[in-house]
Curated annotation (Swiss-Prot):
1D-myo-inositol hexakisphosphate binds at R93, R94, K302, R305, K435, K470. The modification Phosphoserine is found at S191. This is tRNA-specific adenosine deaminase 1. Coiled coil: none annotated. Keywords: Hydrolase, Metal-binding, Phosphoprotein, tRNA processing, Zinc. It comes from Macaca fascicularis. The gene is ADAT1. It comes from the Eukaryota. GO terms for molecular function: metal ion binding; RNA binding; tRNA-specific adenosine deaminase activity; tRNA-specific adenosine-37 deaminase activity. It catalyses: adenosine(37) in tRNA(Ala) + H2O + H(+) = inosine(37) in tRNA(Ala) + NH4(+). Binds 1 myo-inositol hexakisphosphate (IP6) per subunit. Zn(2+) binds at H87, C142, C299. Its EC number is 3.5.4.34.
Length: 502
C-alpha cells in the first residue's frame, strides 16, 4: 500500500536530486509548479497484504515536469517544434509518453524487461497486470478544479495579500486572459486577508491498498455526491451557480478562489459577480496568456480528457490493446477542495457512454498530501519575508523522463533554453517532447519493428504526416469524438494545418 504523503515525498526528493539547478526558480524571487507520474508495482503475491502486515509496493518516478506558462496563439508554429503549453501537468504527461514509447521499444525488440506484455491481437501490447500509475501535482490543476470555496471560520493554508475583490477593476483583471503575470493562476492568493479558505480534513482513507480496488472512487466528499448529469454541456446557469454554494454542514461559502482560465466560446460564461457567484463551475476553460490569448485548454480539462482517452495519446494507441489510465491523482499541500477536484476531473464526464472497446469512463482516486512543495508560490511567499522585488513565476520549464537518451530538457517560451531567433527551426531548437520530436521517436520505433509485425492500423494505408498517424488511430479518434459530442462539445481544437508536419 502507499499514501499520498509517500507519493509527494518521492516526487519532491526526485526533483531535488535528479533535476538540474538550471531551470529551477531563483530563490526568494520565483516559484514554480511540479508534476510527475509515479509507477506503482504491486507485490506478486497479493495474499501477503493483510491488515497486520501490509504489502510493500515498489514506487518509481517515471516522468516529471515543472512549468507555469503557455505561449499565445500568435506564437504557435505549424512545424510542431514549439511547446504550446508548458504547465507542469502537461510537461509531465508528455514525458510519460516518451517513457511509454521507450518501454514499447523494449517490448517489441525483446531486449529488456518492459512494462508491456503481448496483447491478444497482432502487433498490440497491454500493461502488465501488477503495474499502475499515479499522477502527482504540487498544486490543484488550473481551471475548474481551482474554483475552490472559501468558508468562514476555517484556516487558510497560505498567507494572502490584501486586495479589494469587490472593486470592479480587480474583478476585471482576475478573469482577463490578457492580464499581465496571469500565466498560471490555479488559485488566486490575493484574496481579502479576512477570508478563510476551506482545506479538506485528512481522513484515514489516505492510505491506499493495492489490488483490484485501485480503480474505485476514493476520498472524502463532505458536500455530497456530484449529480451524475454534471458536465459542461448540460448544466443550467442556475445549476452551475448552485454547485458553487454547496458546503458541508452549516458553513457559509463567502467566496471562491479565482482561476485565471477563461471560459471557451460556446460555454455559459462567468457571472463575475462579487463573492461566491463570481465563477460558473463545470465549464471548459482556456489558459490565460500574457497579452496574447492561448488555445491551450486548462489542466483540469486536459486531465478530465485523459481519464477517458488515456494518457498515451493517439500515436501510441496504434500499439496498445487498451489505453493507459491513471489510477489516482495526488495533490500537494495547497488551497484544495475535494469536491472541486472530483467535479472537474470525474464529474463532468460521468454520463459518457457508447465508447469503443477498451475505452471507458474511469473512476479515479483523488487524494491530498500534507507535504508542501518547497518552491511553490505558497512556500516561497512565506520564506521571502521582506525580500525586495516581486514574486513571479519561473519562466523555465524542466522536463525529465525515465529514458536512456537525453532524459532532461529545459525550455523557455516553448523552445530549449538558450534558443535564439537564428536557430529556431533547427534540430537543436526542438524540445524532446515537442510534437515533431515525439513523432520522430514514434517513427524510430516503427523502424525497429518488422513491417509484418506492425498493427493493422499502420499497415492498411500509407501514412506520412503527424495528422495522418493521429487520424489512423481509429478507436482513439472514435472515443475522442464521442467524448466531445456527449460532454466537451466546446473544446478548442487546432486547425489541421498545425498537424501537417512530418
Amino acid at each position: 500500500m502507499w499514501t499520498a504523503d509517500e507519493i509527494a515525498l518521492l516526487c519532491y526528493e526526485h526533483y531535488g536530486i535528479r533535476l538540474p539547478k538550471k531551470g529551477k526558480p531563483e530563490p526568494n524571487h520565483e516559484w514554480t509548479l511540479l508534476a510527475a507520474v509515479v509507477k506503482i508495482q504491486s507485490p506478486a503475491d497479493q495474499d501477503c497484504d493483510t491488515p497486520d502486515k501490509p504489502a510493500q509496493v515498489t514506487k518509481e518516478v517515471v516522468s516529471m515536469g515543472t512549468g507555469t506558462k503557455c505561449i499565445g496563439q500568435s506564437k504557435m508554429r505549424k512545424s510542431g517544434d514549439i511547446l504550446n503549453d508548458s504547465h507542469a501537468e502537461v510537461i509531465a504527461r508528455r514525458n510519460f509518453q516518451r517513457y511509454l514509447l521507450h518501454q514499447l521499444q523494449l517490448a517489441a525488440t525483446l531486449k529488456e524487461d518492459s512494462i508491456f506484455v503481448p496483447g491478444t491481437q497482432k502487433g498490440l501490447w497491454k500493461l502488465r497486470r501488477d503495474l499502475f500509475f499515479v499522477f502527482f501535482s504540487s498544486h490543484t490543476p488550473c481551471g475548474d478544479a481551482s474554483i475552490i470555496p472559501m468558508l468562514e471560520f476555517e484556516d487558510q493554508p497560505c498567507c494572502p495579500v490584501i486586495r479589494d475583490w469587490a472593486s470592479s477593476s480587480s474583478v476585471e483583471a482576475s478573469s482577463n486572459l490578457e492580464a499581465p503575470g496571469n500565466e498560471r493562476k490555479c488559485e488566486d492568493l490575493d484574496s481579502p486577508v479576512t477570508k478563510k479558505m476551506r482545506l479538506e480534513p485528512m481522513t484515514a482513507a489516505r492510505e491506499v491498498t493495492n489490488g483490484a480496488t485501485h480503480h474505485q472512487s476514493f476520498g472524502k466528499q463532505e458536500s455530497g455526491p456530484i449529480s451524475p448529469g454534471i458536465n459542461s454541456c448540460n448544466l443550467t446557469v442556475e445549476g452551475l451557480a448552485a454547485v458553487t454554494r454547496i458546503a458541508p454542514g452549516s458553513a457559509k461559502v463567502i467566496d471562491v478562489y479565482r482561476t485565471g482560465a477563461k471560459c471557451v466560446p460556446g460555454e455559459a460564461g462567468d457571472s463575475r459577480k462579487p463573492g461566491a457567484a463570481f465563477h460558473q463551475v463545470g465549464l471548459l476553460r482556456v489558459k490565460p496568456g500574457r497579452g496574447d490569448r492561448t488555445r491551450s485548454m486548462s489542466c483540469s480539462d486536459k486531465m478530465a480528457r485523459w481519464n477517458v482517452l488515456g494518457c498515451q495519446g493517439a500515436l501510441l494507441m496504434h500499439f496498445l490493446e487498451e489505453p493507459i489510465y491513471l489510477s489516482a491523482v495526488v495533490i500537494g499541500k495547497c488551497p484544495y477542495s475535494q469536491e472541486a477536484m472530483q467535479r472537474a476531473l470525474t464529474g463532468r464526464r460521468q454520463n459518457v457512454s457508447a465508447l469503443p472497446k477498451g475505452f471507458g469512463v474511469q473512476e479515479l482516486k483523488i487524494l491530498q498530501s500534507d507535504l508542501l512543495f518547497e518552491q511553490s508560490r505558497c512556500a516561497v511567499q512565506a520564506k521571502r519575508a521582506d525580500s525586495p522585488g516581486r514574486l513571479v513565476p519561473c519562466g523555465a520549464a524542466i522536463s525529465w523522463s525515465a529514458v536512456p537518451e537525453q532524459p532532461l530538457d529545459v525550455t523557455a517560451n516553448g523552445f530549449p533554453q538558450g534558443t535564439t531567433k537564428k536557430t529556431i527551426g533547427s534540430l537543436q531548437a526542438r524540445s524532446q517532447i515537442s510534437k515533431v520530436e515525439l513523432l520522430r521517436s514514434f517513427q524510430k520505433l516503427l523502424s525497429r519493428i518488422a513491417r509484418d509485425k506492425w498493427p493493422d492500423s499502420l499497415r492498411v494505408q500509407k501514412l506520412d504526416t503527424y495528422q495522418d498517424y493521429k487520424e489512423a488511430a481509429s478507436s482513439y479518434q472514435e472515443a475522442w469524438s464521442t467524448l466531445r459530442k456527449q460532454a466537451f462539445g466546446s473544446w478548442i481544437r487546432n486547425p489541421p494545418d498545425y498537424h501537417q508536419f512530418k
